[in-house]
Swiss-Prot record:
Biological process annotations from GO: translation
Originating gene: rplU
Protein name in UniProt: Large ribosomal subunit protein bL21
Transmembrane region(s): none
Superkingdom per UniProt: Bacteria
Pfam families with a match to the protein in the record: Ribosomal_L21p
Source organism per UniProt: Wolbachia sp. subsp. Drosophila simulans (strain wRi)
Amino acid sequence: MFAVIETGGKQYLVKEGSIIKVEKLEAEEKKEVEINKVICISNNGLSYSSNATVKAEVLEQCRGEKIIIFKKKRRKNYRRKTGHRQYITVLRINEISLQK
């Protein structure tokens, strides 16, 4: 069974037991979160679209890899280099359930 969930403006394909990195969620480590924005859920070829929830455990709150932003104007000696690290949450999918 797998599901497509939406969180942080992005969509993720998840299965039970899978580990994903999502945009920062306001939850403590080792706590369980419930994601209600399930776009579709599929079980052995049968697909459903609503009344589903995904329960996940927060494994870690951390920061992602550094993104380098480099700006330059040729022949003008103009160079700017900055970096950015986004806050992310690491989740383990525990349960995909379909409510009836």
